[in-house]
């Protein structure tokens, strides 16, 4: 569904085309910003890892201790990974686990995941091409040419610029949450851009956006994938909650984070997909019965997803 998030922000991108770009290394997957997967471009991956890696490592310390991942083990694992992937040899996580076992390094489950995240943050590995439905790892230096890296101050400013261009209007706390940076760093990034940004006060909070850009009204319907940027990229998500949003929610299955139906900028329900080789079924669970106009726009959103999933 991550590829569907890309398609929603592209012109007629299909699942096959998105997969092809990923396999070719035009889009990479790694742990950046926060301790979770993100798609990044080859041009951005190194400076993003250098900027956000230290904060991610700090978040990982508890699980490292819990699963016995220490500096000595990481050094041994890095050597095994570098040898195993050398020469364009793309391996799955299970295959790398077998390589570790061959070198008498016993690690699995969350501990293995921790080791591989550290390898990503070290700029040792990144995503390789898919093998069927399985993800592989590649050596970053073989996948992405080395180049100049932004210094820390410039990197914070550039990340702020990217965020508010694509997510504004938003607050400094929104940017801090999304980027994983401290609130102090987030505010410094905003301040460094000076006249590039304008701001407005709404309900007691200061919202920043690109100067000269008028926030557009969101009209229409979209079927968003789980953990879509429209909902999770903000510390305060109250502005997308409509009047029909369920008041009592299970935090483990919060509709904000699942596949949501978005109508005119507000959450209006959830949806599910069932895919076969010839068919893409979409099941809707609206929070309330939509009006006729909303039903028509939701139907168009369903058709767009079907076209994405089925077109070659």
Model-inferred region functions:
Residues 1-239, 243-312:
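Long, low-complexity intrinsically disordered regions
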């Amino acid at each position: 569904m991550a590829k569907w998030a890309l398609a929603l922000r592209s012109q007629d991108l299909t699942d096959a085309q998105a997969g092809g770009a990923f396999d070719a290394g035009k889009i990479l997957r790694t742990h950046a910003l926060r301790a979770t997967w993100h798609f990044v471009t080859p041009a951005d991956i190194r400076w993003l890892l250098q900027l956000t890696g230290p904060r991610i490592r700090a978040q990982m310390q508890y699980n490292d201790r819990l699963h016995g991942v220490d500096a000595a083990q990481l050094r041994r694992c890095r050597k095994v990974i570098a040898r195993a992937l050398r020469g364009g040899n793309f391996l799955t996580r299970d295959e790398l686990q077998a390589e570790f076992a061959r070198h008498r390094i016993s690690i699995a489950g969350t501990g293995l995941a921790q080791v591989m995240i550290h390898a990503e943050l070290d700029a040792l590995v990144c995503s390789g091409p898919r093998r069927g439905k399985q993800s592989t790892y590649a050596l970053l230096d073989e996948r992405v040419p080395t180049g100049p890296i932004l210094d820390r101050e410039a990197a914070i400013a550039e990340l702020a610029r990217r965020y508010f261009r694509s997510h504004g209007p938003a607050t400094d706390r929104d940017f801090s949450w999304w980027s994983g940076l401290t609130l102090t760093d987030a505010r410094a990034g905003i301040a460094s851009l000076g006249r590039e940004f304008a701001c407005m006060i709404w309900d007691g909070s200061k919202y920043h956006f690109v100067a000269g850009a008028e926030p557009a009204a969101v009209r229409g319907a979209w079927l968003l994938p789980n953990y879509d940027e429209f909902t999770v990229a903000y510390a305060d998500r109250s502005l997308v909650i409509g009047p029909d949003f369920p008041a009592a929610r299970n935090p483990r299955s919060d509709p904000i984070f699942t596949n949501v139906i978005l109508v005119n900028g507000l959450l209006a329900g959830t949806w599910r997909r069932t895919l076969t080789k010839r068919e893409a079924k979409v099941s809707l669970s609206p929070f309330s019965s939509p009006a006729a106009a909303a039903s028509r726009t939701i139907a168009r959103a369903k058709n767009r997803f079907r076209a994405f999933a089925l077109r070659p």
